[in-house]
Amino acid sequence: KRNFSYWESKNVTNDERYIVDYLNTHSEALENKNILHVGIGNSYVAKKLLSYNKIDGISLSQNELDYASKLNLSNYNFFFQNKYANQNLFDDKLNFYNIIIDINLKSFGCCEVAFNKMFKKYVKIINKDGKIITSRSGLKWSRIIKPVLSFSFKNFFYKRLKEFDGPVSNILSIQNCEEISKKFNLDIDLSDQNLVIFTKK
């Protein structure tokens, strides 16, 4: 397990804020919902939405999981998992989730086959009228992030992730998202300038 330190120490991102604001203003009675958050970061989503909901989270960063554990929030379950790697993930929760939040729906390290398997799993585990929500800025990547060696008196030498300026490249285009919605028989909402929302029919 990699102990890179990055997102758990960052302030809330605009992407997270957009999604939380959207859910608070567009979801009917945002209570008693089952929510899956993919890539929990600093657990901002859990902090804001957990009061009346149950949230599961997965992450590839042990530091993010350790930070989430220290919050000691009830109804918040989280574990180390690569969303592309385990296709048996959540086999016991078919048609279970009302909402899946995945800010970076696809990454450069993911092939088309793995992405399609992952998204097919998402569709299986959301219930009817369930939503898969992603950020438009998460559809493209404009920075290079890689581990660098750092030092602190607490941790001595350790690896953390650092952003470097890089070229803008689309991981998924809006057209790709529209094609995905047709392929998996989902409704797609592009009315929000910051988000893409898929809904299971």
Spans of features found by a protein language model:
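Helix-to-beta-strand junctions that scaffold the AdoMet/dcAdoMet cofactor pocket
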Residues: 110, 126-128
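A short, conserved alpha-helix within the catalytic core of class I
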Residues: 108-121
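A structural alpha-helix within SAM-dependent methyltransferase catalytic domains
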Residues: 47-50, 119-123
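Class I (Rossmann-like) S-adenosyl-L-methionine-dependent methyltransferase catalytic domain
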Residues: 1-28, 41-52, 58-75, 80-86, ...
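Conserved class I S-adenosyl-L-methionine
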Residues: 32-41
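A short acidic, Gly/Pro-enriched loop at the edge of an enzyme's catalytic core
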Residues: 88-100
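A short beta-strand submotif of the Rossmann-like class I SAM-dependent methyltransferase core
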Residues: 102-105
